[in-house]
Amino acid sequence: MTKKYEFDWIIPVPPELTTGCVFDRWFENEKETKENDFERDALFKVDEYGFFLYWKSEGRDGDVIELCQVSDIRAGGTPKDPKILDKVTKKNGTNIPELDKRSLTICSNTDYINITYHHVICPDAATAKSWQKNLRLITHNNRATNVCPRVNLMKHWMRLSYCVEKSGKIPVKTLAKTFASGKTEKLVYTCIKDAGLPDDKNATMTKEQFTFDKFYALYHKVCPRNDIEELFTSITKGKQDFISLEQFIQFMNDKQRDPRMNEILYPLYEEKRCTEIINDYELDEEKKKNVQMSLDGFKRYLMSDENAPVFLDRLDFYMEMDQPLAHYYINSSHNTYLSGRQIGGKSSVEMYRQTLLAGCRCVELDCWNGKGEDEEPIVTHGHAYCTEILFKDCIQAIADCAFVSSEYPVILSFENHCNRAQQYKLAKYCDDFFGDLLLKEPLPDHPLDPGLPLPPPCKLKRKILIKNKRMKPEVEKVELELWLKGELKTDDDPEEDASAGKPPEAAAAPAPAPEAAAAAEGAAEGGGGAEAEAAAANYSGSTTNVHPWLSSMVNYAQPIKFQGFDKAIEKNIAHNMSSFAESAGMNYLKQSSIDFVNYNKRQMSRIYPKGTRADSSNYMPQVFWNAGCQMVSLNFQSSDLPMQLNQGKFEYNGGCGYLLKPDFMRRADKDFDPFADAPVDGVIAAQCSVKVIAGQFLSDKKVGTYVEVDMFGLPSDTVKKEFRTRLVANNGLNPVYNEDPFVFRKVVLPDLAVLRFGVYEESGKILGQRILPLDGLQAGYRHVSLRTEANFPMSLPMLFVNIELKIYVPDGFEDFMAMLSDPRGFAGAAKQQNEQMKALGIEEQSGGAARDAGKAKEEEKKEPPLVFEPVTLESLRQEKGFQKVGKKQIKELDTLRKKHAKERTSVQKTQNAAIDKLIKGKSKDDIRNDANIKNSINDQTKQWTDMIARHRKEEWDMLRQHVQDSQDAMKALMLTVQAAQIKQLEDRHARDIKDLNAKQAKMSADTAKEVQNDKTLKTKNEKDRRLREKRQNNVKRFMEEKKQIGVKQGRAMEKLKLAHSKQIEEFSTDVQKLMDMYKIEEEAYKTQGKTEFYA
């Protein structure tokens, strides 16, 4: 069964606050009238939910402070204006120190610059201390800023109830103002009357009259939720006035559930769970009894915490906090002290408080030598005409606020331009104000050794780390000992410390050009480079001559000049870190993106805005989050889109300022390219569809509104300024857009992607926005509550949207995916399709025959497979080349034999003549007994035998040579034939690849034409993205085909070459057999010992 998530957003409010206490209140503001600057004896209370601090005094209107906008409650506070101080002291006495102990300052704001200070004077110091403690307990309630629309309606009703006039009653006109931006005044007051409330403009009503049920009914009367009614009708199909249990189960599983989720870990909705939901939100007892949901119950469900747009458990600590520091994104600020522009801007201690209270965990201090007799170190933007603040005041503010909103470590990024004497003061103030909060030594189990990772955030809770240049350990040790003995000279050697300097006098020198300032800032941050060197004459970098005490306080954040990724790998020192201006960081990212990601797995990097951003604008942080950069520091004073992305992202994981990077950006065995379009190994790409249906309470004016939906993530996932609804004119209350869904077809990396809703007036002015992480997004019909530009919650403004989430499926694989996801359903659909085809007279066989015919036609186009005849001795003997050699050999043998025959004839004649001469005139008996004749015959026999043997040898030698020549000729012919076969196969393979490339080119052209003619793609960017996606899929498919062809061709070639090798082997064996035969015959002839003669 699907588990119910209990979203407990209420922090119990201490009874002391709900009971209330009488305080005096004073307010120091030029806009405030003199009558309002001091209020006596006001009863202050906090409501039971911890939404508001509200008060009312005799003869004055009631007022409220929304506690989600309260950033701090501070002890003390006395008026600077003498007139207000006079009023305060007349009522509370002239003992200012005692008065200060009884006072509290409540800071509220809707951005980080414009702070409103509410000062109250308590009856005594104990009450002040108790209220400060208790109020701090219920502020910074991250859950309360994410309550559902129905609770927000209740919250607004409570605000109206507390904003009473002098008589203690609620003005009807303030209620009417809630709905004035979309309806006529007459209609609003008519609806108020129908709700049973006074309808006169000047009328008032008691709290007892103005119940929440009446306000909720009035809301639905003035703003009828036709959008929800249409959805209700689509579920019931208009047949009844309720949703049955079966229909509700189907709706929850089909529409309200992410189909990508594992059904074991996240089971489907079933009868028991859906019955629980109906019982929770249905008020009609009869329908509840019948397990049915009415339209009213359906509205309550859709506007409840049960139906939040994101998984609400992500607001709590849900990430592991025991990984090395380098494995986390860290909420970071740039030039924290500035409340305005970078040049000529105002420096403010308050900015340190506000950024830390907002969850920032890395703040920057640009430290310079102080002026005047006390020479107190100051913080300012050097050479930029900015005002100055004292370093010790900044440190005090940091000590006060570092761990109010988060217990996880704070990193102080020092840009140190002070001489050694003043650096001693820097170290002393840090030691004095921070005490045990300052991490002065590395943790015992995390020493500063090469190859060891950084400690995890969980081991650095409530610790402050200093990022400042550090001396070499051996030098630091010696100098620290000398300093402790009082023997260290703190006078700076100008030659050794040319970089230390004083902040410029306003009239001393003109401000540097933005480019020079940027280059110099790069040098100060450790960026270096030619531009930095050129600017160094006018803009000094951080000092390298560090005081040993300050140096000894630096441990896990030791800045060094970046020397390249290879050098960083070689050193392998995790506690070394480098800072990069956004432009330098972008260059490294473009040139060595994978190396940059791997660098950030091991050690930390800090990115800061380039110096040309004089207006304190921000760069897009997403680019550097994609590379795994930890400290992507931004100008918190600018409530622009980059800051919205930053604060929207860091709202999750308890708002602690630390977010664990995705797994593949932490693992050493994984490489990740942030510019890749292809899916990441082990990560399933997603498809997201967003339909903007309607808005509620978008503006308090009758203006036209429209909504933009953007996505930010990897470059391939980022889609901005493309999806925009139509403009709904003159309705800021409840515009209905009902647009076609905006489809983000392929989200390669959902873990890094965020969805942004932006609501704008027709003039382009932003009315509200919301950042939602894609990995925590819930599918279905949801209400998205909006935030201000500075990401502060807005109670009533919201959008009603339908979000669909799917696994991304490339074109052509939809059926395959459907079959894998639901085999039975797919089989049933196929069967139904076949039955429908039969009903149309189309038999399955005919379709099969058509497919077979098409397949046969396709095969006809294909060339028949190559079949090579085996190369044998017989086939080679038929070759002309071999026959030519054979004829030549026959001729040579014939010539030799003729020569031998001629010699035999000549010898024969000679021997015959000699015998005839010897036997002439003799009888047979004489001849038989004549020794001379016998000797002559023996000599002739030997001569003839030797000649015949020689002839035979010469013939055998020629035959053997002929066999060798034939072997060589055959081998050459065989290699030629084999080479021809290989060439024929290579040509065939080349033709196959050429045909494949031609097919790819044709498909690419067809795809371009198809995308161009696709009417569903509205914008050029959408068409370009779709075309790129299709072409990538085509290329991937063709590369796979090419790979398969290559494998197939490789096998064919290997098979042919193996056959050739076998043929050569068989040929050599046959030739050797022939040679052996000749040799045996020759040896046999030699062993016979024949004596030959001619008779």
Curated annotation (Swiss-Prot):
Protein's UniProt keywords contain Zinc-finger: no
SUBUNIT field: Interacts with inaD.
Disruption phenotype: Flies have no photoreceptor potential, their eyes lack phospholipase C (PLC) activity and they are completely blind.
Species, as recorded: Drosophila melanogaster (Fruit fly)
CC per GO annotation: inaD signaling complex; rhabdomere
C2 domain boundaries: 666-794
UniProt xrefs under InterPro entries: C2_dom, C2_domain_sf, EF-hand-dom_pair, PI-PLC_fam, PLC-beta, PLC-beta_C_sf, PLC-beta_PH, PLC-like_Pdiesterase_TIM-brl
Name the UniProt record assigns to this protein: 1-phosphatidylinositol 4,5-bisphosphate phosphodiesterase
Single GO molecular function: GTPase activator activity
Enzyme nomenclature, EC number: 3.1.4.11
Function: The production of the second messenger molecules diacylglycerol (DAG) and inositol 1,4,5-trisphosphate (IP3) is mediated by activated phosphatidylinositol-specific phospholipase C enzymes. Essential component of the phototransduction pathway. Essential downstream component of a hh-signaling pathway which regulates the Duox-dependent gut immune response to bacterial uracil; required for the activation of Cad99C and consequently Cad99C-dependent endosome formation, which is essential for the Duox-dependent production of reactive oxygen species (ROS) in response to intestinal bacterial infection.
Low complexity compositional bias, start-end: 500-523
Annotated ranges, domain PI-PLC X-box: 319-469
Ranges of residues in domain PI-PLC Y-box: 550-666
